[in-house]
């Protein structure tokens, strides 16, 4: 059977085999191992010799990995943390991980009802107690100052959340209109605008509209004050006819006519709606029919002589004139 040296001689030649054997002898001397057995061949290995002695170092290999098996090399490559430290203790990285796991464990504090009552009473006084108040409270209820501080932090967060929820449901802006929005027009203003538009939509020179409007205008009821004034004027005229005209009847009739005319004007030309402005009157003898709602110039001619004011005025003048005849 051929030895290891014979195989090297056959494969690599004498020169290469000598170089490899010399390199192996140098490694043995470096590791403090004696030379080869004098009775054996320089290339043979002893039965109980170190596997490093029989290994051949190639130029790219390290001495520490020569005697290692492939299985041990694979395990060391997969779990570098399991390798022992320089003094045989645990690896520093593994010890750091164990300390991190121990720090992550947190113990939940269970408060007794008496402790909770005392904490709530202090929270009602102030939401941000100082260090002295926390230490005093911790000594009183048998807790640490850090536990009391954490309880106050959690209690403040719960209080703020509850306050925000109640403010959302009780906010006045959710039920009332926004102040920036335009206000809705009143019913009177809307009716006045509708009446003005309906009156102005007809043409001012249309005689059919004036003729059709006369019966409806004549059938309008009188205001209560105007009816009382007319009845009083008729009763005064009848009394003057029965007793005869007194010396100052002319002044009385003139004052009565003037007062009745002023009353007519004051009652008839009060605006029906706040937004409508009455037209000015030129004098007591020339009374226009109604407020000037349209902006056309011929509307005054159409309304003149057809309104209830002019008819009542003529009736009153006729009654006063008949009282002197």
From Swiss-Prot:
Predominant location: nucleus
CC annotations in GO: chromatin; fibrillar center; nuclear body; nucleoplasm
Disulfide bonds: none
GO terms under biological process: dopaminergic neuron differentiation; forebrain neuron differentiation; hypothalamus cell differentiation; negative regulation of transcription by RNA polymerase II; neuroblast proliferation; neuroendocrine cell differentiation; neurohypophysis development; neuron differentiation
Ribosomal protein found in the keyword field: no
Biased composition (Low complexity): 90-102
Pfam families listed in its UniProt record: Homeodomain, OAR
DNA-binding region: 104-163
Segments carrying motif OAR: 306-319
UniProt cross-references to PROSITE patterns, sorted A to Z: HOMEOBOX_1, HOMEOBOX_2, OAR
SUPFAM superfamilies per UniProt: Homeodomain-like (SSF46689)
Gene Ontology MF, one: DNA-binding transcription repressor activity, RNA polymerase II-specific
Gly residues composition-biased segments: 32-42
Biological role stated in the UniProt entry: Probably involved in the differentiation of hypothalamic neuroendocrine cells.
The family this protein is said to belong to: Belongs to the paired homeobox family. Bicoid subfamily.
Protein name per its UniProtKB record: Homeobox protein orthopedia
Species the sequence originates in: Homo sapiens (Human)
């Amino acid at each position: 059977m051929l030895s290891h040296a014979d195989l090297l001689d056959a494969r690599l030649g004498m020169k290469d085999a000598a170089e490899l054997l010399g390199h192996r002898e140098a490694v043995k001397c470096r590791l403090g191992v004696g030379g080869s057995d004098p009775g054996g061949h320089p290339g043979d290995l002893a039965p109980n010799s170190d596997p490093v002695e029989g290994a051949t170092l190639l130029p790219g290999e390290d001495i520490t990995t020569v005697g290692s098996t492939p299985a041990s090399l694979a395990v060391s490559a997969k779990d570098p943390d399991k390798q022992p430290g320089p003094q045989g203790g645990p690896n520093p990285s593994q010890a750091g991980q164990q300390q991190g796991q121990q720090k992550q464990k947190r113990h939940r504090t269970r408060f007794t009802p008496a402790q909770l009552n005392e904490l709530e009473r202090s929270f009602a006084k102030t939401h941000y107690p100082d260090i002295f108040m926390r230490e005093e409270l911790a000594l009183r209820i048998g807790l640490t100052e850090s536990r009391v501080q954490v309880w106050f932090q959690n209690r403040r967060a719960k209080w703020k959340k509850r306050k925000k929820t109640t403010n959302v449901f009780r906010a006045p802006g959710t039920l009332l209109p926004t102040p920036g929005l335009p206000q809705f027009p009143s019913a009177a203003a809307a009716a006045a605008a509708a009446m003005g538009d309906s009156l102005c939509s007809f043409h001012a020179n249309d005689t059919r509209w004036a003729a059709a409007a006369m019966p409806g205008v004549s059938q309008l009821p009188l205001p209560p004050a105007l009816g009382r004034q007319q009845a009083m004027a008729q009763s005064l005229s009848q009394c003057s006819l029965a007793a005869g005209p007194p010396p100052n009847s002319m002044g009385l009739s003139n004052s009565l006519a003037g007062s009745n005319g002023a009353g007519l004007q004051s009652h008839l030309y009060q605006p029906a709606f706040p937004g409508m402005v009455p037209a000015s009157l030129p004098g007591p003898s020339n009374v226009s029919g109604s407020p000037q709602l349209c902006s056309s110039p011929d509307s005054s001619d159409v309304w003149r002589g057809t309104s209830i004011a002019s008819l009542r005025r003529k009736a009153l003048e006729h009654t006063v004139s008949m009282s002197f005849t």
